[in-house]
Amino acid sequence: MACMLLLAACDNYLDIQPTGSVIPNSLAEYRALLARSYKDVSKFSDRGMACFRSDEMQVRDNEYDQNYYMDIERWNDLAPNAYTSSFEWAKYYNVLFIANHVIESRSDIKEGTEEEINQLVGEAYMLRAYVHFLLVNLYGQPYTKEGALDTKSVPLKLDTDLEKVLKRNTVEEVYTSIQADIDEARKLVMKAEWEQRYSYRFNAASVEAFQSRVSLYKGEWQAAWDAAEAVLAVKSVLVDLNDAAATLPNSYNSVENITPLETPLSLSLIHI
């Protein structure tokens, strides 16, 4: 009996919410949680830095740029300069954790309609697919390269288990997971368009736009075409470049944008 009382007391103690912490329960709280992940994704600039390792960009001959980017350009990963900018792969996995938490909590989300909850979870599937897509293309072989499908790329993270030891998955396994998440998102994301202040969120057109990009990277030309046509059927407006006052496509509020989520180049890279 004493043991039972002790266990009950422990359960009650563990149920206490720590002061100053927020454990999401409502739709609004889960939406705020996902909004933080959207913000993190918007700051990813690793692809911009990766351009130093191709013929797209060259580090300028000044002390500042040399300190931060020269060893990236030279592929010096073993003993880089202490000031060398780092690739932020860990932040990608932070976003994956939040996306997984929203997906796993689908049946526990309160104070929202089924449609609103489905939309939120669908966006989480899209975030998970998109982040895995970025990772596999930064750290894996191109999908269409001969023999690439069986090569190791990045670990898939599909749950919130922090104790699980992750192992690298093959390029094919990562792309299979990406496609599965897109398929789930397609069933859940029904929002046609968000008002401008929420335009960073995924909508139905962005699901098909991402599908087109994934198919393109896989060399599935017809599938890429079909998905692109589905997007153009609902979003085909172009910026009039003859208008001096036109908002260019690189702006988040351009009429061409579908989901203005990311900035592939950070401000520190723009003028290099």
Q: What are the language-model segments listed below?
A:
Residues L138-T176:
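Short coil/linker segments at helix-helix boundaries
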Residues C10-S54:
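Membrane-proximal, proline-rich intrinsically disordered regions
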Residues V136-Y143, E193, G219:
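Short coil/turn linking the two alpha-helices of tandem helical-hairpin repeats
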Residues A32, G219, W225-I270:
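Hydrophobic-face positions in mid-chain alpha helices that act as interaction patches
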Residues Y69-Y139, N169, K187-V189:
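Conserved, well-structured interaction surfaces
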Residues L96-A99, Y175, I182, A228, ...:
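Inward-facing hydrophobic residues that define packing positions of alpha-helical scaffold repeats
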